[in-house]
Swiss-Prot record:
UniProt keyword list: Apoptosis, Membrane, Mitochondrion, Phosphoprotein, Repeat, Transmembrane, Transmembrane helix
Gene name per UniProt: Bcl2l13
UniProt entry tagged with the keyword Phosphoprotein: yes
Protein name (database record): Bcl-2-like protein 13
Listed transmembrane segments: 409-429
Region spans: Disordered: 224-245, 282-303, 363-398
Motif (BH2): 190-203
GO cellular component terms listed in the entry, alphabetical order: membrane; mitochondrial membrane; mitochondrion
Cross-referenced PROSITE patterns: BCL2_FAMILY
Subunit structure: Monomer.
Pfam families: Bcl-2
Domain of life: Eukaryota
GO biological process: apoptotic process; canonical glycolysis; fat cell differentiation; mitochondrion organization; mitophagy; oxidative phosphorylation; regulation of apoptotic process
Motif (BH4): 14-30
C-alpha cells in the first residue's frame, strides 16, 4: 500500500488522533495480575501496574491536548476544524473510532497470532528503530488484507508500548511517530480511496462477515426457495405415529376415536361397541353366527336360530317354494331341553355375569316381555321378505317337520334367548353411559 501521495494536514491530524486513541486502549485494560518476566508473546495485552497504567493514561491525554491545540492554531491556514471531522467528532456521541478499530484489532490479533509474536520478538531483540519496526510490520501485513492490513501496525505498536513500558521506558512519543509515519507512507492512498478514516464507522460488523457461524447456530430454521417449496411434505399427524392404537379397532372407527374404546370397561371392547349401534335383529343374527364359529360342537345356537326363523309367518312369503325341507335338521324336544339346561346360549356378552342371567331366566314376567320382543322381531322380519326368500323356505320346512310339542319348547327357548339378549344390551348401554 505504498503511496506517493502527499497527505494533507487534515489527514495527518486524523491519523495522529487514531494512533493515540488506539494506544490509549491499553491504559483502559483491567488489571489481570502480574506478568512474567521477559518478552510476552501472547497477543492479548498483559496488564501493567495500576500506577504505570495511570501514568501512561496521563501521557496520552497530554498528547491529545497538544494535538487539539495544534489543530486550532493551524485552522486559519489549513481550514481544518475538529468539530467537522468524523474522527474527532463522531456523528454518534456514543461511538468512537478507537472502539470500532478495537473490534477489528481483536480479530487481527487472533488470526495473525504467530506472525505478530515473531515480529514483536524480532523488534525487541535489537535496538528499537523505525526501520526495524517498518520491516517487521510489512512482513506481518502480507498475511492480511483490507482494513485488517491497516490494523497490523496499530496492534504491533500497542504490544511494543506494553513491553517497553514494563521495562521502565517511556516510548509513547517515539511509537506515536513510528505509527503516523508508517500509515502515511503505506496506507494513506487506501484510506483516502475508502473515504477517509470516517469510513471505519460504516464497516460491517463481524457477525455479518462470517455468516457461516450464524447458519450453524440457527440450523432449526429453514428458508426454502420458491421452486423447492413444493417438495417439502407436511409433518405426519400424531395419529400416524400411534398406529398401534387403531390396529385393534374395527374399520368404522378411526385412530382419532381410540379414546372411546379405551374408556370402556373390559366387557365392552370394540366388537361390543359396534353391536350396540346395530339393529336388534341384526344383533341376534351376528350373535348366533359368531357363536357358531367359536363353538361348532354346540348345537343350541343353531337351534335358537331355527326358532327365530320358524316364527316368520307363512303369509309373508306366499310364493316361496319348499325344496329345502331336507336340509333343515329336526331337533327333538327332550334334546332341546337338555341343551337349554346344560349349555347356555353363547354370546359376546358372557362377561355380564351369571347372577344377571339367572335373574332373567327365573322371572316369568321377563319371559312375557321376551315374547313381546319376539313378536316385534317377527314383524320386522316380515318387512324384509325380499332378502329372506331362501330363509323362508327353510323356515316353512322346519315348521311343517317339527311336532307341536317341539314347537312350544323351541318357542320358549327362543323367547328366553331374546330376553337374555335384551337385558345384555340394556346393561351394555348403562355401562356406556357411566
Amino acid at each position: 500500500m505504498a503511496s506517493s501521495t502527499t497527505a494533507s494536514l487534515g489527514f495527518h491530524y486524523e491519523t495522529k488522533y487514531v494512533v493515540l486513541s488506539y494506544l490509549g486502549l491499553l491504559s483502559q485494560e483491567k488489571q489481570q495480575g502480574p506478568s512474567p518476566p521477559g518478552v510476552q508473546l501472547d497477543v492479548a495485552p498483559q496488564s501493567l501496574n495500576p500506577e504505570v497504567l495511570l501514568k501512561l493514561k496521563s501521557e496520552i491525554e497530554e498528547e491529545l491536548k497538544t494535538l487539539d491545540k495544534e489543530v486550532s492554531e493551524a485552522f486559519t491556514s489549513t481550514g481544518f476544524d475538529c468539530h467537522t471531522s468524523p474522527v474527532f467528532s463522531p456523528a454518534n456521541p456514543e461511538s468512537s473510532i478507537e472502539d470500532c478499530l478495537a473490534h477489528l484489532g481483536e480479530r487481527v490479533s487472533q488470526d495473525l497470532k504467530e506472525p505478530l509474536q515473531k515480529a514483536l520478538q524480532t523488534i525487541l531483540s535489537q535496538p528499537v528503530t523505525y526501520e526495524a519496526y517498518r520491516e517487521c510490520t510489512v512482513e506481518t501485513a502480507v498475511h492480511a488484507s483490507g482494513w485488517n492490513k491497516l490494523l497490523v501496525p496499530l496492534v504491533l505498536l500497542q504490544h511494543l508500548l506494553l513491553e517497553l513500558t514494563r521495562r521502565g521506558q517511556e516510548p509513547l512519543r517515539m511509537l506515536l511517530q513510528f505509527g503516523v509515519m508508517y500509515l502515511e507512507e503505506h496506507a494513506a492512498e487506501f484510506i483516502i480511496q475508502q473515504g477517509g478514516w470516517g469510513s471505519v464507522f460504516s464497516l460491517e460488523p463481524e457477525e455479518e462477515e462470517y455468516p457461516g457461524i450464524i447458519a450453524e447456530d440457527s440450523n432449526d430454521i429453514y428458508i426454502l426457495p420458491s421452486d423447492n417449496s413444493g417438495q417439502v411434505s407436511p409433518p405426519e399427524s400424531p395419529t400416524v405415529t400411534t398406529s398401534w392404537q387403531s390396529e385393534s379397532l374395527p374399520v368404522s372407527l378411526s385412530a382419532s376415536q381410540s379414546w372411546h374404546t379405551e374408556s370402556l370397561p373390559v366387557s365392552l371392547g370394540p366388537e361390543s361397541w359396534q353391536q350396540i349401534a346395530m339393529d336388534p335383529e341384526e344383533v341376534k343374527s351376528l350373535d348366533s353366527s359368531g357363536a357358531g364359529e367359536k363353538s361348532e360342537n354346540n348345537s343350541s345356537n343353531s337351534d335358537i336360530v331355527h326358532v327365530e326363523k320358524e316364527e316368520v309367518p307363512e303369509e309373508a312369503f306366499p310364493g316361496a317354494a319348499a325344496p329345502l325341507l331336507t336340509q333343515v335338521p329336526t331337533v327333538e324336544a327332550p334334546e332341546m331341553m337338555r341343551a337349554e339346561k346344560t349349555s347356555p346360549t353363547p354370546s359376546v356378552f358372557v362377561e355380564l355375569g351369571e347372577e344377571e342371567l339367572e335373574a332373567v331366566t327365573a322371572r316369568p314376567e321377563a319371559v312375557e316381555r321376551a315374547e313381546g320382543a319376539a313378536q316385534l322381531s317377527e314383524e320386522r322380519a316380515g318387512s324384509r321378505k325380499k332378502s329372506h326368500t331362501g330363509e323362508a323356505a327353510a323356515v316353512r320346512g322346519a315348521k311343517s317337520g317339527l311336532p307341536a310339542e317341539g314347537k312350544a319348547v323351541l318357542l320358549f327357548g327362543g323367547a328366553a334367548a331374546v330376553a337374555i339378549l335384551a337385558v345384555a344390551v340394556g346393561v351394555a348401554l348403562a355401562l356406556r353411559r357411566k
